């Protein structure tokens, strides 16, 4: 969900920040790096406000008072009260968006190599949970199966590069830009929206909802991929092919009732 704290809501969420506050945080230089623009009214969308769709439709229970429909992806469900505290709520919104994005990338990375492999593209190992182990093989790990792209033989080197690169990106995000310009930590815009897809405020509001809906599905997908890997020892595409070939013998119920850990 949106990551800015509740007391920092923009007019996109109902309260317009004053220009002097933006100048104080960003500067009045007229440069390209600015905070995410604001608008004069709340999003005109069915996904926001008190009349937004709820998690059980007309059968939903009373919506908690702190779930007002102000933020994207709010279906009025918080049985455990995890978002009752405003600071926790803001933190959870940020975490959900970040995990959603990683899950969408991860889900694509799990299925795409298998799809390519099924269509004749050569890989050292196309199954996602087996691919990383290739670095321990004698020949090492070749990116896309091509030693001329990236050839790796040291797990420590990969770990170090990942820490540095991901640390840099996360530092950029948390710091609000390379120089601490105060960019939104979750929706910075600028170079992260080169096509200008979020220029229109109402379109931006819809895209936030779509991102979360797809991200939540991707997180469930990743969980399913983990379970499939443990239970079947196969990738998601191979499992799909097995299910289509014999739906009765290859389905979740059949595996659950015959699964023996360690075998």
UniProtKB/Swiss-Prot annotation:
Domain of life assignment: Eukaryota
GO CC, any one term: chloroplast thylakoid membrane
InterPro entries xref list: Chloro_AB-bd_pln, Chloroa_b-bind
* A single MF term (Gene Ontology): chlorophyll binding
Enumerate the residues binding chlorophyll b 2: 101, 150, 179
Listed GO biological process terms: photosynthesis, light harvesting in photosystem I; response to light stimulus
Against SUPFAM superfamilies, the record matches this protein to:
Chlorophyll a-b binding protein (SSF103511)
Q: Where does chlorophyll b 5 bind?
A: 162, 259
Magnesium as a keyword? yes
Q: Where does chlorophyll b 1 bind?
A: 55
Q: Which residues bind chlorophyll a 5?
A: 210, 228
User: Keywords of this protein's UniProt record, alphabetized?
Assistant: Acetylation, Chlorophyll, Chloroplast, Chromophore, Magnesium, Membrane, Metal-binding, Phosphoprotein, Photosynthesis, Photosystem I, Photosystem II, Plastid, Thylakoid, Transit peptide, Transmembrane, Transmembrane helix
Q: Using the UniProt entry, state which stretch of residues is the transit peptide.
A: 1-35
Modified residue annotations for N2-acetylarginine: 36
Q: Does the keyword Transmembrane apply?
A: yes
Task: Locate the residues binding chlorophyll a 3.
Answer: 134, 144, 211
Chain sites annotated for binding chlorophyll a 2: 99
Q: Name one Pfam family in it.
A: Chloroa_b-bind
Coiled coil start-end? none
Supply the domain comment. Answer: The N-terminus of the protein extends into the stroma where it is involved with adhesion of granal membranes and post-translational modifications; both are believed to mediate the distribution of excitation energy between photosystems I and II.
Subunit structure, as described in the record: The LHC complex consists of chlorophyll a-b binding proteins.
What is the documented function of this protein? The light-harvesting complex (LHC) functions as a light receptor, it captures and delivers excitation energy to photosystems with which it is closely associated.
The protein, known as: Chlorophyll a-b binding protein, chloroplastic
Q: Which species does this protein come from? A: Oryza sativa subsp. japonica (Rice)
Kindly list the organism's lineage.
Eukaryota, Viridiplantae, Streptophyta, Embryophyta, Tracheophyta
The gene is RCABP89
